[in-house]
Amino acid sequence: MRRYVLLFLFGFVGTLIAERSFDWGILQMLGATGLFALPFMFVPPSYSVILSLLSLAIYQIALDCLGLRAFVAGFDMGGPLATLSWCFVLSFSASSVGVEVKKEHVNPWKFLLGGVVIALAGFLSSFLVPLNKHLVSCSYIIFSTGLATTLFSLTYFLVEVGGSRIGVLDALGKNSLIIFILSSVVSTFVEVALPASTPVVYPVLITLCTLGGCIALAVVFARRGIYIKL
């Protein structure tokens, strides 16, 4: 619970300081979703997924029937109401990984097949409910969950089965959450440092400098053995 509260507070305070607004960013979404889905972690995995699917369905019905599209679209990440939708991603990932971790041997093929099937289900459902990131539609959530599961499986094959090690990714993974939080700070410094008279390449420069700054922080943390947990 502490981690989710801290994520929400980091996001809330950071947005207030950086943008002087009460917008709903990624960190607020992560914190609120974690707190909302916390009770689901105390029930069997299958029940947890079913409950999160029910939550996702309720959100989509409310979105379509109660005229909430404009309200939700006004926030980044869908705002507080979209917590009902994001809950499925967290519940599914925690439940599926939790079940496999308890086994002596993890079967990555199940994750890969499951990811492809879920992504396909999300794609097919988009013909009924269009994929919409701003509204955090159910098709978007299901499709994204499938893609994330597939990517996780491929990474597992590459690292755990194939034995590949990529130093930069390893460093980023060891402090992924704190690096993500600090990325907004790095981005702010980059925007101040770069000249404003480069309209064409400005977004590219910001992206490259921010990415480079985050990688540099991750490498420094890894070399000094610093691992920050929330």
Language-model-detected regions and their locations in the chain:
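Alpha-helical transmembrane segments and their immediate juxtamembrane cytosolic regions
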Residues: 1-230
